[in-house]
């Protein structure tokens, strides 16, 4: 989101981000992109309605022509505000969004009620066609736009040895051992349990002193799941080898210091 906002600014297009806050705010150039704080994270119907009214003001005051939403709760506010003001509405559908009831599916459907629907992958494109076909019509455009990366940021040659040493010190890891990294928030479908089981098998082959495994990601309040993972490492006697790191502000550096980076997801990734 902030990459697109900066790009638009560089092309002399006014760019605004409405947000309730977050870690990425510190990376936004406030001279190029205007930040507007609203409680758009809330799923409370009353707050969604208040946000809708506030967005009407934001759109009209700043003469905004395109409204883009990436999450369901704010998308409802954006949909209503765009309709009232006659602006184009775009959504990025970037998750499968569980639906166990008709009410939940209706709530999710806001992501396909826009003028243009962006699917983050072929998998998500198929998911939309299979599950939300009745909300699609000839007037709506659905296309796949793969998520890009900042190749300059992820250029390993720009990382200093001193930065690597500092990160390893923070992680309490000695670089004389191989590092196996599993990045991603702590949630069952990301495959952390399978990763730990696999690390145990590697241990049997290589020995306990051969490497460190780093599980990098926040539990986002899933305390019980994290405790389950810790118990699993204890069960396999991996406590001294498997490290849980909540957050890393420089993921490019995390990849650089790692010898192997693992994706262990047990369900299709949205991107």
Feature-to-residue mapping (PLM):
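Short His-centered aromatic/hydrophobic patch
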Residues: 69-75, 93
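A short, active-site helix/loop in glycosyltransferases that binds the activated sugar's phosphate group
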Residues: 114-144, 149-154
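Glycosyltransferase donor-sugar binding loop
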Residues: 17-23, 149, 183, 212-227
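A short helix/loop element that forms part of the nucleotide-sugar donor recognition site in Leloir-type
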Residues: 133, 155-173, 228-230
């Amino acid at each position: 989101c902030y990459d697109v906002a900066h790009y638009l600014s560089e092309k002399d297009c006014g760019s605004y981000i409405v947000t309730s806050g977050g870690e990425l705010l510190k990376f936004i150039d406030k001279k190029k992109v205007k930040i507007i704080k609203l409680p758009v994270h809330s799923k409370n119907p009353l707050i969604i309605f208040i946000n809708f009214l506030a967005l009407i003001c934001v759109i009209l005051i700043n003469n905004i022509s395109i409204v883009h939403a990436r999450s369901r709760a704010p998308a409802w506010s954006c949909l209503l505000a765009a309709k009232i003001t006659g602006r184009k509405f775009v959504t990025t559908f970037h998750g499968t969004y569980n639906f166990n009831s008709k009410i939940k599916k209706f709530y999710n459907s806001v992501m396909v009620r826009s003028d243009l629907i962006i699917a983050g992958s072929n998998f998500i494109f198929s998911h939309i066609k299979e599950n939300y076909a009745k909300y699609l019509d000839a007037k709506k455009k659905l296309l796949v736009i793969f998520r890009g990366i900042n190749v300059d940021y992820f250029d390993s040659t720009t990382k200093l040895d001193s930065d690597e040493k500092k990160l390893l010190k923070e992680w309490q890891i000695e670089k004389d051992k191989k590092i196996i990294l599993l990045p991603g928030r702590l949630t069952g479908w990301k495959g952390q349990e399978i990763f730990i089981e696999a690390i145990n098998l590697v241990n049997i082959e290589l020995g306990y002193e051969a490497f460190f495994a780093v599980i990098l990601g926040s539990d986002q309040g899933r305390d019980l799941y994290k405790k389950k993972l810790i118990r699993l490492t204890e069960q396999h006697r991996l406590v001294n080898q498997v490290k849980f790191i909540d957050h890393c502000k420089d993921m490019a550096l995390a990849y650089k210091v790692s010898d192997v980076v693992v994706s262990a997801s047990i369900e299709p990734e949205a991107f």
